[in-house]
Amino acid sequence: MAVVSLEDLLNAGVHFGHQTRRWNPKMSQYIYTARNGVHIIDLVQTAQLMEDAYQYVRNNADKGKRFLFVGTKRQAAGIIAQEASRCGANYVNQRWLGGMLTNWETIKTRVERLKELEAMEESGQIARRPKKEASVLRRELGKLQKYLGGIKTMRRPPDVVVIVDQRREYNAIQECQKLGIPMISLLDTNCDPDYADIPIPANDDAIRSIKLILGKLADAIYEGRHGQLDSDDDYEEFDESLAEGDYDDYDEEEDEDSETVSSQEGEEE
């Protein structure tokens, strides 16, 4: 059975790329055609590359490899947190801090500080401090939770990194390249496939597209670690607290390409 069907990819809008004037010519091999000024991604290739990515992820998960999901744009943040949490991966969904991987020993001290503050809060130590001091500590705790909460259980740099929006997460990509960490990347038509070890040509702006692709990768991790998924294991309700509301606040019409994409979706229906 296929990992994902062409119908599922089509229904999720995975095929809609960016406006033709914003393309990266290196993506031409993954583009099927252009329609109304928007590039259309070849879903036959996407489906096959999803098969390859799924097997790669499942095999690595079976070997005990560790995964990091990275996606800080609003429409990806909540999905990143949800799917990474579901399969036991770490994630960064707010802002990539410079040196998060290449300067891990320093970042790790901040993670330890986060754990320390959480323990203090849970035990009531912060509440017993003077009001001003408690406020400062809680503010520090909140900031650390926001930026480092998704890597709190990460003991060393990951073995595989999943990237949503290659252009936005360029700093993360540079660090992965420097450390030789393989990357699975969703590649929209404005991306550069040279920076992806495992490419998945796909719309990286639409929530449904991101959800479908990341959901399948999370399934592969879960299956590699725990065995075949049961039907009840596939998905769980989205927890809004994981992304601080960014997931639901996204308005597709704010994106320059989305009005064209929306009109084309309407035509197909």
Curated annotation (Swiss-Prot):
Record Pfam families: Ribosomal_S2
Disordered as annotated region, ranges: 228-269
Compositionally biased spans, kind Acidic residues: 230-269
Keyword Ribosomal protein: yes
UniProt-recorded Gene Ontology molecular function terms: structural constituent of ribosome
Gene Ontology biological-process entries: translation
Keywords on record: Ribonucleoprotein, Ribosomal protein
Record has Kinase as a keyword: no
Domain of life of the source: Bacteria
Xref: InterPro entries: Ribosomal_uS2, Ribosomal_uS2_bac/mit/plastid, Ribosomal_uS2_CS, Ribosomal_uS2_flav_dom_sf
SUPFAM superfamilies: Ribosomal protein S2 (SSF52313)
Gene Ontology CC: cytosolic small ribosomal subunit
Family the entry assigns: Belongs to the universal ribosomal protein uS2 family.
HAMAP family per UniProt: Ribosomal_uS2_B (MF_00291_B)
Name of the protein in question: Small ribosomal subunit protein uS2
Species: Crocosphaera subtropica (strain ATCC 51142 / BH68) (Cyanothece sp. (strain ATCC 51142))
